[in-house]
C-alpha cells in the first residue's frame, strides 16, 4: 500500500540562512513543503527564492509568538510585539480570541499578497494553533477557505467535516539526536499505526546570526545533512512512501 509523506520545513522567512536551507533541502533532498511566516524578517527573500522553486508547496505558518503582528493586538502584545507569554494567557484562559481571529485573516491575506496564491495549508509557529481555545478558530477558517490544516490527532479536537488534514503528524524529527535512523523510525511508527498519510515537521537551515540566537541552532544544520542524504530518499521509497504535499491530501 502506497503512503503519502509530506516533509514540511517550518520557518520559511525567519532568516536568510533558514530560507537557503529550506530551498537546499527541497532542491537536493526530500523536503516537499514549507510554511512561511509572513511577519518574518526575511519573508521577502523567501518569496524571491520560491519563484525559482515551483515544486515547493508553500503553506502559512501562523505567528502569535514572535515579531510584530499585522493588526492591533493590545491583548496579546507587549510593547507592540508578540512573545511566548501567550502560554500564560492560555493557562489563565485570557486569550484575546477576537484579536487572534482578525490577525489570522490578516496574515492569510498578506500571504496571498506576497506569494500571489493561497497557502497549501495552515500550521503555526510553536504549535499555538493546537491550543484548545485557538484550534476551533483556525480549523473553521481553514475549512471555509478550502485549505488543509496541520493537526496532531493525539491532541486534536472535533474537526470540521470538510477539513483536509493528514492521518498522522510527527514532530519527533527534532532535538540533539537528529539522524537518518530517527527519521525512518518516525515512518515505521506511523506505518504501525496504519496511517496512510503522514506529515513530518523539520527545520533545515544554514547557520546565520538569526539562527545563532535561536535555542534550536546547530541541529538545524544536522537536519539539512540528513534530509539531503541520497540513502534516506531510497529508504523512504523502499518503505512504500510517496513524497507529496497537502495538495495531495
From Swiss-Prot:
The lineage of its organism: Bacteria, Pseudomonadati, Pseudomonadota, Gammaproteobacteria, Enterobacterales. GO terms for molecular function: chitin disaccharide deacetylase activity; deacetylase activity; metal ion binding. Disulfide bonds: none annotated. The keyword Metal-binding applies. Belongs to the YdjC deacetylase family. ChbG subfamily. PANTHER family: CARBOHYDRATE DEACETYLASE, YDJC DEACETYLASE FAMILY MEMBER. Keywords: Carbohydrate metabolism, Chitin degradation, Cytoplasm, Hydrolase, Magnesium, Metal-binding, Polysaccharide degradation. It is found in: Cytoplasm. Mg(2+) binds at residues 61, 125. It is an enzyme of class 3 (hydrolase). Its cofactor is Mg(2+). GO terms for cellular component: cytoplasm. Its EC number is 3.5.1.105. This is Chitooligosaccharide deacetylase.
Amino acid at each position: 500500500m502506497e503512503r503519502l509523506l509530506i516533509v514540511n520545513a517550518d520557518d520559511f522567512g525567519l532568516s536568510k540562512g533558514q530560507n537557503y536551507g529550506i530551498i537546499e533541502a527541497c532542491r537536493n533532498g526530500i523536503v516537499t513543503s514549507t510554511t512561511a511566516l509572513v511577519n518574518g524578517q526575511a519573508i521577502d527573500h523567501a518569496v524571491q527564492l520560491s519563484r525559482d522553486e515551483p515544486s515547493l508547496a508553500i503553506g502559512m505558518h501562523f505567528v502569535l509568538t514572535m515579531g510584530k503582528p499585522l493588526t492591533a493586538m493590545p491583548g496579546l502584545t507587549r510593547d507592540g510585539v508578540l512573545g511566548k507569554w501567550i502560554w500564560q494567557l492560555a493557562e489563565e484562559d485570557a486569550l484575546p480570541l477576537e484579536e487572534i481571529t482578525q490577525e489570522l485573516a490578516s496574515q492569510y491575506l498578506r500571504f496571498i499578497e506576497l506569494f500571489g496564491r493561497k497557502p497549501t495549508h495552515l500550521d503555526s509557529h510553536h504549535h499555538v494553533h493546537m491550543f484548545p481555545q485557538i484550534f476551533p478558530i483556525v480549523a473553521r477558517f481553514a475549512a471555509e477557505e478550502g485549505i488543509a490544516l496541520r493537526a496532531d490527532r493525539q491532541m486534536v479536537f472535533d474537526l470540521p467535516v470538510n477539513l483536509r488534514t493528514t492521518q498522522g503528524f510527527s514532530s519527533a524529527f527534532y532535538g540533539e539526536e537528529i539522524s537518518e535512523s530517527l527519521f525512518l523510525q518516525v515512518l515505521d511508527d506511523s506505518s504501525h499505526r496504519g496511517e496512510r498519510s503522514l506529515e513530518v515537521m523539520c527545520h533545515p537551515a544554514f547557520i546565520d546570526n538569526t539562527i545563532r540566537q535561536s535555542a534550536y541552532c546547530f541541529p538545524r544544520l544536522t537536519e539539512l545533512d540528513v534530509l539531503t542524504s541520497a540513502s534516506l530518499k531510497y529508504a523512504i521509497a523502499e518503505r512504500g512512501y510517496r513524497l507529496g504535499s497537502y495538495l495531495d491530501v
